[in-house]
């Protein structure tokens, strides 16, 4: 017999859908009438089920019909005698009377169970594939174990050690102090139990994050089936899984992926609330709060999302039952209390956070310029070129080679999904996807575009891509008359295969996507170096280790993660031993990256250098040198000569306007001295090793000056200025200090009156740095 023309074949990854439940009770059903168009000679199999209000199956009846060869339509009447009798469920509490138009409230947990039960084996298999591509070789990709991952477990261990108090002695704190700022919260708390069970482990720390990353995969698949009426919930799971930005970050312990996971759950339960489940607002609010506390850029993303959702569905919200509204408001107030507590205890911390991030909002520029910067960054976060193609904005460790943040092959499907969302804008589910897209870059724009701050985009992108692909599949079914089962299985295998291809590519080619393995790049080596130190110490307990920290951020945090505090490991750069005589003995083993090893060789300050071992970088080159050495016999003489040389000023003549100025200055390793007088704020000088920078400017004829302005960097600075006035025996002195800032800024000295100046002597010091050091200066302007 030919296939039915109007009834699609079964989806191999989805259980058979029940007929919609009648609104009346089972006892009132006397007849069911179906009008179906059939190809001539088609046999029709009908399954009629009765369900409880929460979706539980009570009874089922199957019937078979056949159309004549000449028939193209048939009307089927199923008499009451053939309608399956509905076994009555256990007596339940009488329904609450509701006002006309008020929302109904089906049991939330029962609905969730039904949704999961009907998701199908394809959905379950897709989740297995998702987890497999996250857990396989978890420590090998990303190749680095970053300090921002290690700090989660280190803070958790300190929290347990200190009686569930943070470093400020706050019991069960809202936020934990991370180096310079309070910015970690939920990501620390979720590591406590794993730490107590398994201790410090890269697999465990990352594995916890991976398990939470399943949340958007589950919620995305269920949302795709439940709110977008798709028969392919696995499409959303596999589409999310192959988004490169998510593939990379969901395999790390960065708090950004955790915040995105909670954000996805917030969206899911909000959409469930929009399907006449008012009590779904409770978990929606809880997951929104978890995302809010997990990652600071999520805070503005959530605010923007919540405001737009409120306005978008205002008429629906006004029908919210009073008791649900009151409980939701109470729950929200309860979840705000930890933030209020934190704000009262640390009122300046939000400002400090923006300072640490270098936000332009704190710069001394007009408000209109700040707004322009914000919307410029925001629009850049919506630019498809940023998302689908390689870029130079993000640092290499946050990029998967040439993949782009969103898979370029998904671009046409996502674009078609956006079209469908706009077309179906009257549907709350589609509007929510567009709102999530609009909100995603809002948090990043406060500081600057970066994938960790805009990672929220992967959630709507994956669902939009799944919508576009599902629509394309339906088009293929109509155009090619291909069997649905074959197309579904083929698409599933293609997406699943690409998941494992991406995993294999990351584990092999990914090791050389970037060959910058140092501080400015991948920061490779934490697990490898510290594991070797532990192994070395077990065989040679008398050895003392001096490890350079210059190859990674927060090397002290990494050391605490991998090595017990009792082990003899000291963090120090080779420069500590090059610039001053620092004692060490023959039991000292230096561990240096290539650049520091080369400086030690070239310095002529050490002898008897012996490399005992090397640890290679992923490209095969030596990445770390384990060596022993000692100072040369005349080291004190060499260091004394270098200190004296730093005080010797270089002399040069600089033309400023029509005058030639004689300038004496400290040795430079960046920029000519003329950069200070070219009226260009983009050019600068930097001292080779002197701190403070010393400058003497001699005018050929006296200049009438009222003050002096230096364009300095963001570091804390101290200025000592001596002004020689024509006819005076001694120079007038001025002293000024500026604290650290977020951007380069002017440092101005007002003389208080007009002076006839013959020379200026400037000493500019980085307040918090010692010598040798680097001092930066952009411009000198007198008035």
Which ranges hold each PLM region?
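Hydrophobic/aromatic-rich transmembrane helices and adjacent perimembrane loops
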Residues: 250, 300, 405-413, 430-476, ...
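Disordered, acidic Ser/Thr/Pro-rich linker "stalks" and the adjacent N-terminal cap
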Residues: 631-701, 711-715, 779-781
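Membrane-proximal, lumen/periplasm-facing interface regions of secretory-pathway glyco-
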Residues: 175, 403, 484-574, 717-720
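Membrane-interface transmembrane helices that cradle and orient dolichyl/undecaprenyl
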Residues: 227-230, 263-284, 291
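Aromatic, loop-rich ligand-recognition surfaces of beta-strand-rich domains
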Residues: 678-734, 743-783
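Short acidic/glycine- and proline-prone juxtamembrane loop motifs at membrane-interface regions
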Residues: 145, 245-256
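Transmembrane-helix motifs of polytopic, lipid-linked glycan transferases
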Residues: 207-229, 265, 412-419, 467
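Transmembrane-lumen/periplasm boundary regions of multi-pass, lipid-linked membrane glycan transferases
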Residues: 152-165, 197, 273, 299-415, ...
């Amino acid at each position: 017999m030919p296939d039915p023309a109007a009834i699609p074949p079964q989806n191999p990854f989805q259980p058979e859908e029940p007929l919609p439940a009648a609104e009346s009770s089972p006892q009132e059903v006397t007849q069911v009438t179906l009008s179906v168009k059939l190809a001539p000679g088609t046999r029709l199999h009908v399954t009629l089920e009765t369900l409880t209000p929460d979706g539980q199956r009570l009874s089922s009846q199957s019937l078979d019909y056949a159309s004549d060869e000449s028939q193209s339509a048939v009307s089927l009447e199923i008499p009451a005698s053939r309608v399956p009798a509905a076994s009555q469920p256990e007596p339940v509490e009488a329904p609450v009377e509701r006002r006309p138009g008020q929302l109904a409230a089906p049991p939330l947990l029962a609905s969730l169970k039904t949704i999961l039960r009907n998701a199908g084996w394809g959905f379950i298999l897709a989740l297995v594939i998702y987890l497999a591509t996250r857990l396989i070789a978890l420590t090998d990709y990303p190749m680095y174990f970053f300090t921002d991952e290690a700090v989660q477990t280190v803070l958790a261990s300190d929290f347990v050690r200190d009686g569930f108090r943070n470093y400020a002695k706050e019991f069960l704190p809202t936020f934990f102090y991370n180096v310079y700022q309070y910015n970690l919260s939920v990501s620390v708390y979720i590591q406590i139990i794993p730490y107590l069970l398994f201790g410090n482990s890269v697999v465990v720390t990352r594995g916890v994050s991976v398990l939470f990353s399943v949340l958007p995969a589950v919620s995305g698949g269920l949302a795709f089936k439940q709110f977008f009426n798709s028969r392919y919930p696995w499409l959303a799971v596999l589409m999310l899984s192959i988004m490169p930005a998510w593939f990379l970050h969901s395999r790390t312990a960065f708090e950004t992926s955790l915040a995105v996971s909670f954000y996805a759950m917030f969206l899911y339960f909000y959409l469930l609330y929009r399907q006449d489940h008012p009590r779904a607002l409770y978990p929606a609010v809880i997951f929104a709060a978890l995302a809010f506390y997990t990652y600071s850029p999520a805070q503005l993303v959530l605010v923007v999302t919540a405001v737009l959702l409120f306005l978008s569905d205002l008429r629906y919200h006004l029908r919210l039952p009073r008791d649900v509204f009151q409980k939701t408001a109470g729950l929200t107030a309860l979840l705000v209390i930890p933030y209020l507590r934190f704000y009262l205890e640390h009122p300046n911390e939000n400002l400090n956070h923006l300072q640490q991030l270098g936000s332009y909002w704190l710069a001394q520029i007009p408000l209109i310029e700040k707004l322009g910067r914000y919307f410029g960054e925001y629009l850049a976060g919506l630019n498809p070129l940023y998302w689908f193609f390689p870029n130079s904005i993000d640092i290499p460790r946050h990029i998967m080679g040439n993949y782009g943040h969103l898979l370029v092959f998904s671009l046409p499907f996502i674009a078609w999904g956006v079209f469908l969302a706009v077309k179906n804008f009257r549907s709350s589910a589609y509007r929510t996807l567009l709102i999530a897209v609009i909100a995603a870059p809002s948090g990043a724009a406060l500081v600057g575009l970066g994938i960790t701050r805009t990672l929220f985009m992967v959630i709507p992108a994956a669902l939009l891509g799944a919508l576009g692909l599902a629509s394309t599949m339906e088009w293929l079914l109509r155009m090619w008359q291909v069997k649905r089962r074959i197309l579904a299985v083929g698409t599933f295998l293609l997406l699943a295969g690409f998941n494992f291809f991406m995993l294999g590519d990351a584990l092999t080619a990914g090791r050389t996507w970037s060959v910058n393995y140092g501080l400015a790049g991948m920061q490779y080596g934490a697990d490898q170096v510290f594991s070797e130190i532990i192994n070395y110490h077990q065989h040679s307990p008398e050895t003392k280790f001096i490890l350079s920290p210059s190859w990674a951020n927060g090397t002290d945090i990494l050391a605490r993660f991998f090595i017990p505090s009792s082990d003899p490991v000291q963090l120090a750069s080779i420069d500590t031993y090059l610039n001053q005589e620092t004692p060490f003995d023959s039991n000292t083993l230096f561990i240096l990256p290539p650049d520091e090893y080369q400086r030690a060789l070239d310095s002529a300050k050490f002898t008897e250098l012996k490399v005992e071992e090397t640890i290679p970088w992923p490209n095969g080159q030596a990445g770390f040198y384990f060596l022993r050495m000692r100072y040369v016999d005349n080291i004190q003489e060499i260091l004394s000569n270098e200190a004296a040389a730093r005080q010797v000023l270089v002399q040069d003549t600089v033309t400023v306007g029509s005058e030639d100025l004689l300038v004496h200055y400290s040795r430079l390793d960046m920029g000519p001295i003329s950069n200070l007088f070219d009226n260009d704020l983009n050019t600068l000088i930097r001292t080779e090793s002197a701190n403070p920078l010393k400058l003497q400017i001699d005018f050929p004829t006296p200049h009438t000056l009222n003050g002096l302005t230096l364009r300095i960097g963001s570091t804390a600075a101290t200025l000592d200025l001596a002004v020689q006035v024509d006819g005076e025996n001694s120079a007038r002195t001025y002293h000024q200090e500026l604290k650290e800032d977020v951007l380069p800024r002017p440092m101005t000295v007002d003389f208080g009156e007009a002076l006839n100046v013959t020379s200026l002597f400037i000493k500019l010091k980085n307040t918090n740095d010692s010598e040798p050091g680097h001092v930066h200066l952009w411009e000198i302007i007198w008035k």
